Amino acid sequence: MVNRVEKLSLLSEMIAFAKYDKDIKEIEYNFLLGVAKQLDITREDFDYLIEHPVTYTHLKSHSERIVQFHRLVLLMNIEQEDNNNNSVGAIKLYNFGLRMGLSHESITKVLYLMESFPNKIVPPDVLIDIFKTQYN
């Protein structure tokens, strides 16, 4: 499991993802706050991170990086409910995935498969299988 510094880094990364091109919408804020609660980060610390991002900490565990990528996929889908500019979100997600050290083939496959699922949400088991295939 990740330590507190890594948890703050994960959350800070998600906040940066949400703020990439604009302010955080209420629905994004609530989603991120839910992730913060899952990570045992207080609301005060979460609100502080919005204005004061922490330095990116690379996750050592491949499985933790996949989980974080899945969170970003979900966040991207929330962002795009009101926005039809799918290419900006896809590019943003692709770049964040590369920065996490995930394979570009897997990221591309996830982005491609998103179109075939309801609400563009790739089920966790499908996502894991995609990355597992590339990892082996």
Question: Where do the model's predicted regions map?
Answer:
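Small-residue-enriched hydrophobic alpha-helices in membranes
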Residues: 1-18, 23-136
